[in-house]
């Protein structure tokens, strides 16, 4: 009887270990796309409060930026309540302004800003991206240095 309880406990422990190992594999798989290229993606929320210095605005935005192996960049952000004049991905930690890395393309609806085809990060820019030191900035006539900002957090 005692041996049977020990045997069942050992089997239960092995099954639990196998389930945890498989769950870990599923999490790792989410970092790969269907062509087995590594993908880092950032969902981004744009607000005036993130600007440096912060601005008061009713405008907002959100989007998703993806960086694949080879450092190619894709994605877009959609804004509301703003007539944007330009939008970029900039280098800079939260609370700091930085240089333009990639200029975004404005759609015909005037509210969607997309990463242009073929855009890539340099190795140094990719390192900054992985550290959370890139951000999206949407400029307007009222706020030439930026009205909406959102930090990219891979």
Where is each model-derived feature located?
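Metal-centered catalytic cores of metalloenzymes
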Residues: 2-8, 21-87, 91-154
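Hydrophobic helical h-region of N-terminal Sec-dependent signal peptides
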Residues: 11-20
């Amino acid at each position: 009887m005692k041996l049977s309880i020990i045997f069942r406990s050992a089997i239960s422990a092995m099954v639990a270990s196998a389930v945890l190992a498989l769950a870990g594999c599923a999490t790792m798989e989410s970092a790969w796309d269907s062509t087995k290229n590594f993908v880092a993606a950032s969902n981004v929320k744009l607000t005036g409060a993130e600007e440096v210095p912060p601005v008061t605005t009713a405008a907002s935005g959100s989007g998703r930026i993806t960086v694949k192996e080879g450092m190619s960049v894709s994605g877009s952000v959609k804004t509301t309540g703003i007539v944007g004049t330009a939008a970029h991905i900039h280098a800079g930690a939260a609370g700091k302004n930085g240089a333009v890395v990639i200029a975004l393309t404005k759609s015909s609806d005037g509210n969607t800003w997309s990463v242009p085809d073929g855009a890539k990060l340099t190795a140094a820019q990719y390192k900054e991206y992985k550290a959370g030191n890139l951000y999206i900035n949407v400029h307007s006539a009222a706020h030439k240095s930026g009205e909406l900002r959102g930090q990219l957090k891979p």
